[in-house]
UniProtKB/Swiss-Prot annotation:
Keyword Ribonucleoprotein: yes
Biological source species: Parvibaculum lavamentivorans (strain DS-1 / DSM 13023 / NCIMB 13966)
Database matches in PANTHER family: 39S RIBOSOMAL PROTEIN L28, MITOCHONDRIAL, LARGE RIBOSOMAL SUBUNIT PROTEIN BL28M
Protein name: Large ribosomal subunit protein bL28
Cited SUPFAM superfamilies: L28p-like (SSF143800)
Family of this protein: Belongs to the bacterial ribosomal protein bL28 family.
GO biological process, one term: translation
Alphabetized GO MF terms: structural constituent of ribosome
Length: 96
């Protein structure tokens, strides 16, 4: 399981710890990932996703999982989230 957010694409970054004496040692910046269960209103199902805290706030800000996925670009979504987005689009096209 990679340390990458399934909705926002946030991943591990690398950089330096810099001491007061300006010595640099390598370090990793890990994303704040949470295992959450989100509900799709269009599909009427629950989905367990590994999401960063930043993406979770964005989902709530957009009004839920469905509006967030429909607004999100395909490049930043994982393959599971992209399949979910396509399924939501298909259900909404049939309902319209």
């Amino acid at each position: 399981m990679s340390r990458r957010c399934e909705l926002s694409g946030k991943a591990v970054m690398s950089g330096n710890n810099v001491s007061h004496a300006n010595r640099k040692t390598r370090r990793r910046f890990l994303p704040n990932l949470c295992q959450v269960t989100l509900i799709s209103d269009a599909l009427g199902r629950q989905f367990s996703l590994r999401v960063s805290a930043h993406a979770l706030r964005s989902v709530e800000h957009n009004g839920g999982l469905d509006p967030f996925l429909l607004k999100a670009s395909d490049a930043q979504l994982s393959s599971r989230a992209l399949k979910l987005k396509r399924a939501i689009e298909k259900v909404q096209a049939v309902a319209a």
